[in-house]
UniProtKB/Swiss-Prot annotation:
Keyword Cell membrane assigned: no
Known partners and oligomeric status: Component of the NDC80 complex, which consists of NDC80, NUF2, SPC24 and SPC25.
InterPro entries: Kinetochore_Ndc80 (IPR005550), Ndc80_CH (IPR055260), Ndc80_sf (IPR038273)
Domain of life: Eukaryota
UniProt-annotated stretches for the region Disordered: 1-42, 66-119, 155-205, 351-373, 559-582
Any one annotated GO CC term: Ndc80 complex
Function recorded in the entry: Acts as a component of the essential kinetochore-associated NDC80 complex, which is required for chromosome segregation and spindle checkpoint activity.
Compartmental location: Nucleus; Chromosome, Centromere, Kinetochore
Protein name in UniProt: Probable kinetochore protein NDC80
TM regions (residue ranges): none
Biased composition (Acidic residues): 567-579
Length: 788
């Protein structure tokens, strides 16, 4: 399909879609593009209309996409053919089950309204436009699956045909890793993050690069790259490329996707990065903006992979037709046709004053109702809609009649089945009864001879029992005669027996009640003990948990004490006492006397626990939970900051890896230079060897002179040692004299000290005696004054 000649495709690639990749261009660009004679405004008439079919689950909008949804919704290549066959069958049988979406906004607003056409139209289901992608999840078999999908979509461009010619052209991931290790290339096994983000395509394999280059060149030739760009396609254009050639190829491939997009010359590298992000290029992590400064060299395989990925994307889109962009529902097709025609009128400025006057006159004739009933397109749409609705109503009536006939047949058959089931059940029951009766008759026939013997025994027993009854009656009469003679009647005896029976029954009832109460009390006491034990276990578990809380508070206090070490020790002790008083000591302690008490009453929660209020404990726990929540929020904010720092560091690591590769290239160049230096050094070494031999002779002569000088120095050293020993003896004598003088001085000082102390003691005694005398004189004077 020629993408430039399709009006629907051009509309979808207008500002409503392509503008999403560069919002600044949508707001500031007031230029107009001509498309098949229809003027399309890029700035003022910004409209979006996305119609997505349900037939192709992997076909979704291109530029407003989400790569994750595309991967999740993309079927595997092995099941694409089955799904296409099923979809063709379902499209022939039931077209009414399909739905589509039409999102339309006027030129002056940005609000989105859902398209509705009366109460009889199907409710439109909104789909968020997601990216059109094949299943390109990073795995070792991704390339084969992707090529199979392309073969299903476009058999002409089939990279697997080349692989059949060269079986070893696409090595496996294991072979590629071995090649990396042999070439001293840093593999991605150094860290788990790099393994997850590694591009599984063997882009650095030369055979694989040749296959990719052939595919790209074939695509460029078929779509007339040389004519449109005036750049000649040669074999070296993709082997030793330039920055200009890469930019031109990328522009051409992207314009195949979005013909209306305009590139900015000053910042094309930044545009490429943003466009790849919008297209959700799956290996964007391997590219940074610094790589675009030097496209060639070691960075070229990654850029070659970008171009090949764009070629595959264009090939997959080349199989789409105009019908793929239309709705599957007939009502939607009618409504879309109406919107398309009215939209083309709006874009071409064909809504002139004459049409407006006609609409106003027709609205006045219709009494102000109808809202544009004279519109030609609207009338056509209404006629088609009515015809389609009549057709569907007829089909629906036919289906309802068939449904009623089938229901009647179903009820008739169901009644017949019920009668048959009842008959079967009755026959089964009769057969069971017959078998039981037959077995019973057989048992009776077997027991017949034994019954005669038992009848004779029973008759003899009856005769003996009758004789015993006669004897007992005679005894009864004799006892009654005796009681009458004694004055005791039989009725009184019977009454006494009845009272005794009643009393015995009442006693039994009371005893049974007592036993029941004892059992209930024992069960209640057992339950109470069990509940008390459970409560004790719960308190122990609670205390174990709260010990951790107390330890947490203790750690906080220690931290506060370390921060306040500059204060005085007394103030620290006082603050520690106050802090210990303010610490909420978590924990509960049961009153063990509850088991032993005989009080018959119900204990409250506060009475069960010793010196602890449960409400206060609960309040302390709530405060502690609030503190923990506050700390968790702080920790999360710090974690977010750390994650941001990690992302920055990862970007730095990627840049450093690229620098390392460049340094390795420099290292290989330096090795070559070092080999050249080794040869020059070997020549210089030979020259120096000849010089060394001449210098050895000079060294021998100098050694003989040095030995004679050493002998002279040894003689001088002996003389110096003798002088040293004499000086040491003189110093020892002087030191002994100094020690004697020091001892004499110390003895003199001690004597002087003792004499002074004795004199001071005597003076103190004299002073005390004088004070006593003066005090006695003062007392005598006071006494004499008092007497006077």
């Amino acid at each position: 399909m020629s993408q430039t000649s399709n009006p629907i495709y051009g509309l979808r690639r207008n500002n409503g879609f392509a503008g999403g990749s560069n919002p600044s261009n949508n707001n500031n660009n007031n230029s107009n593009n001509n498309h098949n004679g229809n003027r399309i405004s890029l700035g003022s008439a910004t409209r979006t209309s996305s119609i997505i079919s349900n037939n192709l689950p992997f076909r979704q909008s291109l530029l407003h996409g989400n790569y994750d949804n595309a991967i999740n919704n993309t079927p595997s290549t092995s099941s694409l053919q089955k799904q296409s066959q099923q979809q063709q069958q379902s499209s022939q049988t039931s077209q009414t089950k399909r739905r589509s979406t039409l999102l339309s906004t006027p030129a002056t607003t940005t609000k989105r309204r859902q398209s509705m056409m009366g109460n009889n139209l199907h409710q439109q289901h909104q789909y968020g436009s997601t990216a059109l992608r094949h299943s390109t999840q990073p795995s070792s078999s991704m390339n084969s699956q992707f090529n199979q999908a392309l073969q299903h979509v476009s058999p002409y461009y089939n990279p697997t045909s080349y692989s059949s010619q060269t079986p070893s052209s696409q090595p496996s991931s294991q072979q590629y890793q071995q090649q990396q290790q042999q070439a001293n290339i840093p593999s991605s096994a150094s860290s788990s993050q790099q393994q997850q983000s590694m591009d599984p395509r063997p882009l650095k394999d030369k055979k694989y690069q040749e296959l990719i280059q052939k595919e790209i060149i074939r695509y460029l030739i078929d779509y007339k790259f040389e004519i449109k760009t005036n750049i000649a396609l040669t074999e070296n254009i993709l082997k030793s490329p330039t920055q200009k050639n890469f930019n031109a190829i990328f522009k051409f491939l992207y314009n195949q996707l979005d013909p209306n997009y305009m590139f900015i010359k000053s910042s094309i590298e930044q545009e490429i990065v943003t466009l790849l992000k919008l297209l959700n290029y799956p290996y964007m992590h391997t590219i940074t903006r610094s790589h675009f400064s030097a496209v060639g060299g070691n960075n070229w395989p990654t850029f070659l992979g970008i171009l090949y990925w764009l070629v595959e994307l264009n090939l997959s889109l080349s199989t789409l037709n105009d019908d793929d962009f239309l709705a599957d529902d007939d009502f939607d097709k009618i409504f879309i046709e109406y919107i398309w025609k009215s939209y083309s009128l709006f874009i071409n400025d064909e809504e002139e004053e004459e049409q407006q006057q006609q609409e106003q006159q027709q609205q006045a004739n219709n009494g102000g109702s109808g809202g544009g009933g004279g519109d030609k397109f609207y009338n056509d749409m209404k006629i088609k809609f009515d015809q389609l609705q009549e057709k569907l109503n007829q089909e629906l009536n036919n289906v309802e009649q068939q449904h009623e006939n089938l229901l009647n047949k179903y009820h008739e058959l169901n009644n017949q089945l019920k009668i048959r089931d009842d008959a079967l059940k009755k026959t089964v029951a009769l057969e069971e009864d017959y078998m039981k009766l037959k077995s019973y008759n057989q048992n009776v026939e077997k027991m017949m001879p034994e019954w005669n013997k038992k009848l004779e025994q029973l008759s003899n027993e009856v005769i003996s029992y009758e004789e015993q009854m006669n004897k007992l009656q005679d005894e009864k009469k004799s006892i009654e005669m005796d009681l009458q003679q004694r004055g005791i009647s039989i009725d009184k005896v019977n009454e006494l027996y009845i009272k005794r029976d009643q009393l015995s029954k009442s006693i039994e009832i009371i005893s049974n009640k007592i036993d029941d109460l004892k059992e209930k009390l024992s069960g209640r006491s057992f339950d109470l003990e069990k509940n008390f034990d459970n409560l004790e276990n719960l308190t122990n578990q609670y205390n174990e948990i709260t010990n951790k809380f107390n330890y947490y508070y203790y750690q906080q206090i220690q931290q506060n004490q370390q921060q306040d070490q500059q204060q005085q020790e007394e103030e620290e002790e006082e603050e520690e006492e106050e802090e210990h008083q303010l610490i909420p000591q978590f924990g509960l302690k049961l009153d063990e006397n509850i088991k032993t008490t005989n009080e018959r009453r119900q204990f409250t929660r506060d009475e069960i626990f010793l010196n602890i209020n449960v409400k206060q404990e609960r309040q302390n726990l709530l405060n502690f939970r609030n503190e923990l929540d506050h700390q968790i929020l702080n920790d999360r904010s710090q974690a977010m900051k750390f994650n941001e720092k990690c992302d920055i560091e990862q970007d730095k690591i990627k840049d450093q890896q690229s620098i390392i590769e460049e340094l390795k290239i420099q290292d290989s160049l330096m090795k070559r230079k070092s080999d050249d230096l080794k040869q020059t050094i070997f020549q210089i070494q030979n020259e120096f060897n000849s010089q060394i031999e001449s210098l050895d002779q000079q060294i021998r002569e100098t050694k003989s002179n040095i030995q004679s000088d050493i002998l002279q120095l040894e003689r001088k050293l002996r003389d110096v040692n003798l002088n040293k020993s004499l000086i040491q003896e003189q110093l020892i004598g002087k030191r002994q004299k100094i020690d004697e003088d020091v001892i004499n001085l110390t003895s003199f000082i001690l004597k002087f000290k003792t004499n002074i102390q004795e004199k001071l003691i005597n003076i103190a005694d004299i002073v005390q005696d004088q004070l006593k005398k003066e005090q006695q004189q003062q007392q005598q004077q006071q006494a004499s004054q008092q007497l006077e």
